[in-house]
Amino acid sequence: MDEMRKDPTRGQWVLVRPKAKAAQAGECPYCPGAEHLTPPEIAAYRKDGPGPNGPGWTVRVVPESDPYFRVERELVREGVGMFDMITPRGASELILESPRHDDTLASMEPEQLEAVLWMYRDRLLDLKRDSQIRDILVSRRHRKPGVPPHHPYSRVTAIPIVFDETRRELREAREYYQYKRRCLYCDILRQETGAEERVVRLTKAFVVLVPYAARLPLETWVLPRQHGCSYEDAINGEAAPELARLLSGLFRALERGLGDPSYELLVHTAPNLRSRILQGDWATIRDDYHWHIEVLVQPERANRLGGIFISETSPEVAASRLREAWEPEA
């Protein structure tokens, strides 16, 4: 039986489950016309076509065929002697980003990428209606080493706990706010836009930058200039097209400058505020946390020594390279 077990020495959760069966080679189940090969769709944007579970879609959401987390499970929190266990209730979804099998975030038109960003918002809003879901990760991996090219998709993972990375970020943001009564990320924005040496792109609503202590060469953040803790509350008719144009420009710059490298996109947004367990949980989160997007370029090349990241390229040089590779605006 699948279950989540907590390591009390590190405060981390581990998912224990049998190894998934390898996918059979053959027809791509995510291309138009093969909708019968996937579980029934959860959501879709369609311009035409016969309706649900048929062709004509522009963006489509389906459950993973062998999901890590299932919404049908009963949430059970149990003590096993001194240890803690939780059933992996949640959701494991794939957002099929384009009908085209060979599309990438660099090759698709900004309008198509904008539709993907709207679907990110829709899935976060829908899943956060479930108070047993505590945190949701929206991620996108491109060109994972050892994995053949496949239909473009993002992954949505909803879980009954808070992800370790989210928990660390929330703690740092809260402690900074408690000490200074200011948002950590708003201060980063003021510092970086004033200095400019690590800024790659600056628009009315967003800043693209290489962070001061980048863990990887060309690690890039996209931060909204207007404070807000949740991605889904910030995406609107003005923000979505601007963010799509920026991300399109970033991925094309990476392709032009590095020859289509691997990367991982992560949407960092507040956990599900409906799932508060204790009275004081996230009491200041709307003031202290700031949603953003992180792009980790070639994450498989991360170099660490005892948990300390070692970057062989300074963030200032990395930002300069990205500025040079960015396609001039028409």
Give the residues covered by each predicted segment.
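Active-site microenvironments that recognize anionic phosphate/pyrophosphate groups
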Residues: M1-H151, T157-A234, F251-R256, D260-Y263, ...
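Gly/Ser/Thr-rich active-site loops/lids in small-molecule metabolic enzymes
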Residues: N236-L246
